[in-house]
């Protein structure tokens, strides 16, 4: 199989990720739920992964790294921490349903900072116009449909100047685009473990630079006499048993990325995307949605066939062993 669907889930994991996940299932119990060696081994792995993620994203305190089920879970925590029913919230025009559906469910007044594709200056201007009076803002770092790298740093500066807390969706950026999460100045940064971080499905991370509200309540293995969730991170948000095998695999994925260098991965992926785009544009039947400015384009690439439905094209490619995704990509 030629696997070209890593924007949904990375399939070809490093062997170290598979080994670490399997080893955790054989040798690790639950962190904070016992003093025996299997529980202590699990606790050490979870903490080490927290430290590794903090180092990768330049987070000064590892406890600000909260493990979640996926990016959707992380975004829901962030949104429910900042948004109340009726609040005006600014979003970009490229957000995933993991942003738009929670906002709709909360009854937020959503303002879309609309801007043309691959025009970062227009995106900044759109946010500048939409921010006054907003209670929160959400912006994806990279569009999961077009691979468009939005000017999140500039948008974050606008939000800070306006006193509007920002949530950054780094689902398509984490592990593929080098960035300093702490320097962004965002309230929260959400990401999955199973895409660019090369971890197993069922893993995610929320980087917390503001005080969050728990989305789930339950056992934390700490401060059990309290009726409410602990105030301290990460326990405040990590109710219930951790996905220890997933976190062990995620740790191996992060270590692989750190050894390779995210900057090197980013350069290689962009070169490959540019080569593919150039080749696709030699075929008159195909339309490739990619920026001419490599600074705006990541390795996520959308293509349309002018005389064939995209679903049918994906089926034909699957017949030849090429895995792609067609449709709205959860971002209509």
Regions found by a protein language model. Name each.
Residues 1-332:
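Pyridoxal 5′-phosphate
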């Amino acid at each position: 199989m030629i696997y070209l669907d890593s924007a949904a889930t990375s399939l070809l994991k490093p062997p170290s990720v598979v080994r670490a996940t399997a080893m955790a299932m054989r040798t690790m119990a639950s962190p904070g739920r016992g003093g025996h060696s299997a529980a202590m081994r699990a606790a050490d792995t979870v903490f080490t992964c927290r430290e590794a993620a903090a180092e990768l994203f330049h987070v000064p305190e590892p406890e600000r790294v909260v493990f979640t089920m996926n990016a959707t879970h992380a975004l829901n925590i962030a949104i429910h921490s900042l948004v109340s029913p009726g609040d005006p919230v600014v979003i970009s025009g490229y957000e995933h349903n993991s942003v738009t559906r929670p906002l709709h469910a909360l009854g937020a007044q959503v303002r879309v900072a609309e801007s043309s594709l691959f025009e970062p200056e227009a995106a900044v201007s759109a946010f500048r116009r939409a921010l006054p009076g907003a209670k929160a803002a959400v912006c994806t770092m990279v569009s999961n449909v077009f691979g468009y790298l939005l000017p999140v740093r500039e948008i974050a500066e606008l939000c800070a100047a306006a006193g509007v807390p920002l949530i950054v969706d780094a689902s398509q950026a984490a592990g593929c685009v080098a960035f300093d999460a702490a320097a962004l100045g965002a309230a929260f940064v959400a990401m999955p473990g199973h895409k660019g971080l090369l971890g197993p499905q069922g893993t995610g991370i929320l980087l917390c630079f503001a005080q969050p509200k728990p989305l789930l309540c339950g056992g934390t293995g700490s401060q059990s006499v309290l009726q409410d969730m602990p105030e301290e991170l990460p326990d405040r948000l990590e109710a219930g048993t951790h996905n220890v095998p997933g976190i062990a695999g995620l740790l191996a994925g992060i270590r692989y990325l750190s050894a390779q260098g995210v900057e090197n991965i980013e350069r290689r992926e962009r070169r490959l995307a540019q080569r593919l785009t150039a080749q696709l544009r030699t075929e008159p039947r195909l339309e490739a949605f990619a920026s001419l400015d490599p600074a705006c384009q990541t390795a996520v690439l959308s293509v349309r066939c002018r005389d064939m439905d995209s679903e049918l094209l994906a089926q034909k490619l699957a017949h030849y062993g090429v895995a792609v995704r067609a449709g709205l990509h959860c971002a209509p």
